[in-house]
Amino acid sequence: MFLSPSAAMHDKILILDFGSQVTQLIARRVREAHVYCEIHPNDVSDDFVREFAPKGVILSGSHASTYEDHQLRAPQAVWDLGVPVLGICYGMQTMAVQLGGKVEWSDHREFGYAEVRAHGRTRLLDGIQDFATPEGHGMLKVWMSHGDKVGEMPPGFALMASTPSCPIAGMADEARGYYAVQFHPEVTHTVQGRKLLERFVLDIAGAKPDWIMRDHIEEAVARIREQVGDEEVILGLSGGVDSSVAAALIHRAIGDQLTCVFVDHGLLRLNEGKMVLDMFEGRLHAKVVHVDASEQFLGHLAGVADPEHKRKIIGREFVEVFQAEAKKLTNAKWLAQGTIYPDVIESGGAKTKKATTIKSHHNVGGLPETLGLKLLEPLRDLFKDEVRELGVALGLPAEMVYRHPFPGPGLGVRILGEVKRDYAELLRRADAIFIEELCGTLATEQDAAAGLCEPSQVGKSWYDLTSQAFAVFLPVKSVGVMGDGRTYDYVAALRAVQTTDFMTAHWAHLPYALLGRASNRIINEVRGINRVVYDVSGKPPATIEWE
């Protein structure tokens, strides 16, 4: 473990991860309060905790059982530091056990919405409520997810919250600044959760809200210059938000010492290559090496239908192409990557066996060892929304910074089954039409009246009102009629979702007129597609991408 440069320059909160699926949401809420924080595994050393010197500590939830598993505990240093501590779900239970309380099986497990009654006037919950009962008790609408519960509070703790099935749903030792809740304040389902976390971070822990992107640019530029000196840097430019912002930031710091390598694998969106080159060569005057490797990628993908196999082939071929180009740049000493904080967290989760792989990521993690280059990751402390904010501050156009996420393997995982050049071309055109209709259609008062959007969203484009939207190519044919003739062509599926964190997502309720126009245009303008369907699956159970 090592301290990041950002950790040394700001007040900070330490989040200890016990394996929850939503630990990243805790960090996002803290960052939204403009306070720097980092997530680290619960089994970090006492020395690391002391060196980190947090203003406060948050203990995450977990899929494990405190009642059964005596290994997942917070380091002793957490309790010796003398700083406020907030336990969430499992974090509450381990706080209870470690400080002398007891945890027991719950006869009634709680998963989903619940209403919690506040007790007393603790600093954490004072004045925070969703409604009051006729008797005047403050109530909170929260999200529960637990099978165990605290049966006996540790010495010094008082009851802070309860539900009928969980008599101790919150507890506090105000003298020591220890607070714990059985529910999850980090998820959006807990209505007052953001306010609760801000109360802990800003008021109780006393952290300064000085984590601001425009100031971060100056810090990052100075850090890059100090790291790199007069040496040269190479970066794989994909056109995605992360690599684009990383390139712009590094170019701001060292100018022509940076060379970007843009690999076209034949699976990009319509005109994506031109947009990237116009931006970085034309506007930023950065050095860009453009490699058309579409024949190589598509050749190796021929006959391959399995999604995992496709991802691995694309990742492998990217490494091969990038490596060949990098070797031509004999003066390069650094490899820059657009690694962001969720990547860092997920890598740590994999190492501690606390995370499950749903889909392989096609990153270039093996390149530094292969090429003998030092690694430069200027975005590794930032979440995606912070990366976008940084991109705007760096002067990148909004249409690039706020473009919807695009998978590393590109259209390769939006073409079901085998990838073929003609499939990719059909999909590119269908996708562009769908996105064009979303961008060109504004939400109306009628949409708001129908419940499709909020009144405050009237006048915004449906592209901005969706978190991710794209077309999928289905390698099946259906019968159609065009003019007086019979057609037998392929099917395109349209997918649009709305989400705050991409961990869960709802399918977007788009206006029928918009969907109708997109469908008609695709069928009429993309020869080879004669049917369009709309995906109405949420996440879970479906994933956002089809493969």
From Swiss-Prot:
Keywords: ATP-binding, Glutamine amidotransferase, GMP biosynthesis, Ligase, Nucleotide-binding, Purine biosynthesis. It catalyses: XMP + L-glutamine + ATP + H2O = GMP + L-glutamate + AMP + diphosphate + 2 H(+). Pathway: Purine metabolism; GMP biosynthesis; GMP from XMP (L-Gln route): step 1/1. It comes from the Bacteria. ATP binds at S238, G239, G240, V241, D242, S243, S244. The active site is at C89, H184, E186. One of its GO terms (molecular function) is ATP binding. Its EC number is 6.3.5.2. Residues 12-210 form the Glutamine amidotransferase type-1 domain. Pfam families: GATase, GMP_synt_C, NAD_synthase. Residues 211-403 form the GMPS ATP-PPase domain. This is GMP synthase [glutamine-hydrolyzing]. It comes from Burkholderia pseudomallei (strain K96243). The gene is guaA.
